[in-house]
């Protein structure tokens, strides 16, 4: 029996593990009505859970914790860095923190565990992460995914053999030795590593002046690059130059892609009754989809929708949206973001690892004063008609009017790429001006 598909995942008829039938919902808290469960069904469900041998609930919890971390990290980065256009890969950051957790002890370990919601030494966590990474990086000719993390550690630091073994086993991670006293050489080493792990698209990520001296240091670096083809391609000949209303109210002309397809679509509202729409656009293979979220009212700020985002709301959207044939308009855009995670992670409760007096990494080395001096994250995403770089020719086509429903992302929106099987948010970002 596949323990990752146990009872707690639910069934297509909408019956929950407690015999509940969902009859209504909001975007955050589904409303359920409870009916008596037939005795035979109760025992069958109980037997199924026993077969799972405790894996059902841990796996569901891990899915939710992964999503919750993604949401909170995104919200912190958007607010602490005051970003307009941004993209991050929460999955990449989480794996980097997981690698650090192997070597952390004391309150440093506790802070990472509390923020991630799990302990990497737990066997179920290791199995879940390994399975998720294997599926995620199973690239084909239509999909390219590069996920990697590295710890750059001061040369001469005696590294624990056990930690080195953890590094080799943990999600395309590596341990790199460097000399932080040679600032420029360290920057070149990190930049070269990043360039190799972002499809060759990043030449400069750090500068030599970012590194201090006086303590033994660790630089935590994580990257993720994603490029794939749509399940239903946008027709390049249908791409038009259309107006997009940016955050400040100004209008810019952007290349707006178009497709007519059967997509999952839903209309929701926040607890304060601000309405928004969500559309799901799958990539080839149906393992990853892009969810595009846009306020319904032009006067509703995107931040009011983002601030109410939770892991439960994302699960609700994915489970309750309905298939409908409609016209989709989505701007062509490419985002590339660099993030210094120190402020965002500290705001999430992970602060000791950045303090040379409090950081405890005795699991990495018995060397004192070992701390994280840099936490660097790079993410890139490119959204185009067919998933490959478009040529320089722009076709101007006036689309015929249609009576079908229309979803037009002609105002600021946020998006996230979600892996269907694990529910993990691979990327999350916002677009306020597609031309940036």
Q: Model-derived features: where do they sit?
A:
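Non-catalytic, conformational "gating/processing" segments within enzyme and secreted inhibitor domains
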Residues: 83, 122-304, 316-402
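Short, solvent-exposed secondary-structure boundary motifs
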Residues: 7-8, 12, 23, 76-79, ...
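Structural recognition of the beta-strand scaffold that forms the well-ordered cores
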Residues: 95-98, 290-292, 416, 427
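Hydrophobic/aromatic-rich, well-ordered segments within soluble, folded domains that form packed cores
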Residues: 88-105, 214-230, 424
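C-terminal soluble interaction/assembly domains
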Residues: 385-436
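Detector for small/aliphatic-rich hydrophobic stretches
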Residues: 2, 6, 32-184, 192, ...
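Intrinsically disordered, low-complexity basic segments at termini and long loops, enriched
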Residues: 1-36, 396, 403, 432-433
């Amino acid at each position: 029996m596949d323990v990752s598909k146990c009872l707690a995942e639910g069934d297509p008829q909408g019956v929950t593990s407690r015999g509940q039938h969902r009859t209504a919902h909001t975007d955050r808290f589904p409303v359920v009505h409870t009916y008596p469960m037939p005795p035979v069904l109760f025992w069958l469900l109980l037997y199924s859970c026993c077969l799972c041998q405790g894996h059902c609930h841990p796996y569901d919890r891990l899915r939710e914790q992964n999503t919750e971390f993604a949401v909170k990290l995104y919200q912190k980065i958007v607010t602490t860095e005051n970003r307009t256009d941004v993209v991050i890969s929460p999955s990449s950051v989480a794996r980097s923190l997981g690698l650090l957790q192997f070597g952390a002890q004391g309150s440093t370990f506790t802070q990472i565990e509390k923020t991630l919601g799990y302990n990497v030494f737990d066997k179920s966590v290791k199995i879940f992460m390994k399975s998720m990474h294997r599926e995620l990086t199973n690239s084909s000719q239509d999909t390219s995914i590069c996920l990697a993390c590295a710890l750059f550690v001061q040369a001469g630091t005696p590294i624990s053999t056990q930690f080195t073994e953890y590094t080799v086993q943990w999600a395309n991670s590596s341990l790199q030795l460097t000399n932080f006293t040679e600032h420029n050489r360290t920057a070149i080493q990190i930049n070269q590593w990043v360039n190799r792990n972002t499809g060759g698209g990043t030449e400069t990520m750090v500068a030599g002046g970012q590194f201090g001296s006086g303590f033994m240091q660790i630089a935590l670096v994580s990257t993720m690059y994603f490029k794939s083809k749509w399940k239903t391609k946008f027709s390049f000949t249908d791409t038009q130059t259309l107006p997009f209303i940016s955050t400040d109210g100004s209008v810019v002309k952007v290349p707006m892609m178009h497709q007519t397809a059967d997509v999952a679509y839903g209309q929701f509202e926040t607890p304060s009754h601000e309405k928004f729409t969500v559309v799901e656009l799958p990539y080839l293979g149906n393992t990853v989809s892009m969810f595009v979220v846009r306020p319904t009212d032009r006067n509703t700020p995107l931040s009011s929708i983002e601030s109410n985002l939770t892991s439960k709301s994302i699960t609700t959207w994915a489970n309750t949206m309905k298939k409908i044939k409609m016209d989709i308009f989505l701007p062509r855009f490419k985002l590339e973001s660099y993030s210094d995670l120190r402020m965002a992670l500290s705001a999430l409760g992970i602060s000791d690892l950045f303090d040379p007096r409090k950081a405890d990494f005795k699991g990495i080395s018995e060397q004192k004063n070992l701390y994280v001096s840099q936490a660097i994250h790079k993410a890139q995403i490119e959204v185009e008609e067919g998933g490959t770089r478009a040529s320089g020719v722009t076709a101007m086509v006036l689309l015929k009017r249609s009576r079908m429903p229309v979803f037009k992302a002609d105002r600021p929106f946020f998006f996230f790429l979600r892996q269907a099987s694990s529910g993990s948010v691979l990327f999350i970002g916002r677009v306020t001006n597609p031309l940036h």
